Amino acid sequence: MKMKKKRKDKKLSLKKIISMSAVTAVLCTSTLTPASITTETSTAKTLSTKEITATENPVTTKEPVTTKKPASTKKPTSAKKPTNTKKPTAAKKKKSNITKITISAAGDCTLGSDYKSPSSVNFYAKYNEKKNASYFFKNVKKIFKNDDLTLVNFEGTLTKRNTRAQKTFAFKGNPSYLKILQKGNVDAVSFANNHCRDYGEGSYQDTISVFKKNKMSYASYGKVSVYKTKGKKIGMIAVNGLEGVSSSEYYIKKGIQKLKKKKVNLIIVSMHAGIEKTSSINDVQKSIAHYAVQHGANLVLGHHPHTLQGIEKYKGAYIVYSLANFCFGGNTNPADKDTMIFQQTFTFKNKKLKKTKDVKIIPCKVSSSNSINNYQPTPAKGAAKKRIISKMNSFCKPYNLSFNKNGKLK
């Protein structure tokens, strides 16, 4: 019995040994097979590439962030605060901040007549014939509409008084005639001359009341005027040089002081001075005009001679010594019908007035008819235009100024 058991035990242990050897052999083979190494490496690569991919995605997304930090760092966009800093755009906006003010000036306007003038052809007759206030400035109203300020000399009175002054010529018109200026796009008047009291002191006050009632800007002796356009203030002073140089200088000095307190951007002085029916400029005109510029006037406009005179550039400002007649009811048929509209464009850059010579003249006739005064100022054409420009060039020659064939200052 014991022997059988031993044999059985031997058989069992042999089986164990054999199976263990087989297991060992299998284990050894499977561990050291090159195929199994490759698979593990692939898995490792797969894992590591996923890990890389996983880590690369953050890097990539962060790199947009980091590259977006160049984008933020590329604060060229913020650094496109060069765009703001590159305030050439802001500087270019300052260019669009340039303001141009065009002023048109014309001469003596008498809306009415002397009662001694021929009743069939005087101003009253023409007004009654046309029954239309737009008739008188019809041919120049577009010019005046396209500027920023139109200024004329108002010579006469708007009154119903009959207390005529003892003088050779005395002018008055119906107060309703003011609408002639309004329909013609006239914005302001100077009112300091030898005809503003033709029907007594009362007629002067009546006329001013008409201006005020109709909101017409006016300057007269000590009364200055401020006209606002395009965010700029234009100050106006009017003096009567026929009453003496010292009187004019007084009003100019006081007027400029008042206007400077009002912080105006431009100052225009209108002076009524000179000798009638001559192209010669006298010392009174020069003295008053130069004084005005020396004290701060940017432009001086003259009238009274009833004929054109030269233009001078003095210390950077233009002086127009005489603008002649314009819509002039004071003469039914003047021998000299030549006149003009003077225009100057002032340029402001960053609120500062630039030095420019943007000046032109528009040759005109006081009438659209050559044979009579029909009180309808009209731009000259063809030979008449050429002749008036040539005339002005001869008047301006002493001051070294001249105009081209279109009336533009050379």
What are these regions, as identified by a protein language model?
Residues 1-3, 41-43, 66:
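Acidic, serine/threonine-rich low-complexity intrinsically disordered regions
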Residues 12-30:
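Sec-dependent N-terminal signal peptides
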Residues 29-47:
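Sec-dependent signal peptide cleavage junction
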